[in-house]
Amino acid sequence: MLDPKFLRNELAVTAERLATRGFILDVAHLTQLEEKRKSLQVATEELQAARNAISKSIGQAKARGEDVDAIMAQVGDLGSQVDAKKLELAAVLEEVNAIAMSMPNLPDESAPIGADETQNVEVRRWGTPRSFDFPIKDHIDLGEGLNGLDFKSAVKITGSRFIVMKGQIARLNRALGQFMLDLHTTEHGYTEAYVPLLVNEASLLGTGQLPKFGEDLFHTKPATEEGQGLSLIPTAEVPLTNLVRDSIVDEDELPIKLTAHTACFRSEAGSYGKDTRGLIRQHQFDKVELVQLVKPEDSMAALETLTNHAETVLQRLGLPYRTVVLCTGDMGFGSSKTYDIEVWLPGQNTYREISSCSNMKDFQARRMQARYRVKADNKPALLHTLNGSGLAVGRTLVAILENYQNADGSVTIPEALRSYMGGLTQIG
């Protein structure tokens, strides 16, 4: 949520910056609503003052033995007018709030201006894609050939865009999540958290999934009242970031760095027909999430650090990747600046996103009222929040299967994972 004061005082600037994201702000309508709000506010306060002044005269009139029925009627009439104005004001404020909740974050000045993903800017590459001297397979053929990926059973049990993993591939998938958690907690300074996979509406509003992206979520309909309105998490960013909702942390506690390995659930409502085969776009997938809560002056540096933490996973696994900074038209709703990390997939002969690392600045914190107490003046100030995948486990599995495949259909296990696989060096 944007700063209301900045929005009111810099409406034209806000509209101009939001336009670079493809969001057209109706300045005229918002200005009209603001004028109406001011007018109703003044009218309400004047009526309240008049009612209070007349109310005081009732006691005086009674003391003089005068009839107060007319005065009482006048007070009642003014009270009705106050109530009516309050209702009008509440309706205007509700509309203003709905508009404010629909606005994406303002892009950082360092984010390149562009309309879509074709105008994202590559900032670096790591590793060289492997040259194969045999016909390569994609992860689907490799996984099915190794009896480790069972798409048919998943369709029978649930439906499309789900997977059943078996044997050593299931073990490899588990090893990846454990490896990522160990790296981030022992070397990068994150605290591991175990979090609920079901969250309430307030949590989703806080991190920005609601109200805009409700159709992308899976919502529960329990038989009992307890649990009504819960939704499956689309990312562990939601529960991790909401740990500081409606709270004030001490400045000495910052930065707070959290990580969790969870299943994530997305309906993929807007991606019909995209990546219909394989593990790239699933309704249920595992992800290791990284969240940082920092002071405002530290957030841009924290974004670089967090992105590096995600990149380190790929480097340790020996997987080629590139990092791009997203243009304004391709950034997520709550982000002010985002880096996407894209891993090389030989089966698709291209780089595909495996992590998205974003600085939300105070956008989420304002929604959540997540603050810290500034030591200098002992006053609360909004935190800056950051998040990123460290990494998407399923897509990392895809990258390993395709990059480490052998001519006979077997897959070599990266050295960094062998201790998690009981010393196994190859699957198949």
Swiss-Prot record:
Residues binding ATP: R266, S267, E268, E353, I354, S355, S356
Enzyme Commission (EC) number: 6.1.1.11
Entry annotated with the keyword Mitochondrion: no
Molecular function in Gene Ontology: ATP binding; serine-tRNA ligase activity
One of the Pfam families matching this protein, by short name: tRNA-synt_2b
InterPro entries linked: aa-tRNA-synt_IIb (IPR002314), aa-tRNA-synth_II (IPR006195), aa-tRNA-synth_II/BPL/LPL (IPR045864), Ser-tRNA-ligase_type_1 (IPR002317), Ser-tRNA-synth_1_N (IPR015866), SerRS_1_N_sf (IPR042103), SerRS_core (IPR033729), tRNA-bd_arm (IPR010978)
Pathway as given in its UniProt record: Aminoacyl-tRNA biosynthesis; selenocysteinyl-tRNA(Sec) biosynthesis; L-seryl-tRNA(Sec) from L-serine and tRNA(Sec): step 1/1
Catalytic activity: tRNA(Ser) + L-serine + ATP = L-seryl-tRNA(Ser) + AMP + diphosphate + H(+); tRNA(Sec) + L-serine + ATP = L-seryl-tRNA(Sec) + AMP + diphosphate + H(+)
Subcellular location: Cytoplasm
Keywords: Aminoacyl-tRNA synthetase, ATP-binding, Cytoplasm, Ligase, Nucleotide-binding, Protein biosynthesis
CDD domains referenced in this protein's UniProt entry, alphabetically: SerRS_core
Broad class of where this protein is predominantly found: cytoplasm
Swiss-Prot/TrEMBL GO biological process terms: selenocysteine biosynthetic process; seryl-tRNA aminoacylation
Superkingdom to which the source organism belongs: Bacteria
GO CC field: cytoplasm
SUPFAM superfamilies: Class II aaRS and biotin synthetases, tRNA-binding arm
Residues given in the record as L-serine binding sites: T235, A236, E237, E289, S389
Subunit composition and interactions: Homodimer. The tRNA molecule binds across the dimer.
Domain comment, as recorded: Consists of two distinct domains, a catalytic core and a N-terminal extension that is involved in tRNA binding.
Primary role: Catalyzes the attachment of serine to tRNA(Ser). Is also able to aminoacylate tRNA(Sec) with serine, to form the misacylated tRNA L-seryl-tRNA(Sec), which will be further converted into selenocysteinyl-tRNA(Sec).
Family, per entry: Belongs to the class-II aminoacyl-tRNA synthetase family. Type-1 seryl-tRNA synthetase subfamily.
Name of the protein this chain belongs to: Serine--tRNA ligase
Natural source organism: Shewanella sp. (strain W3-18-1)
Lineage: Bacteria, Pseudomonadati, Pseudomonadota, Gammaproteobacteria, Alteromonadales
The encoding gene: serS
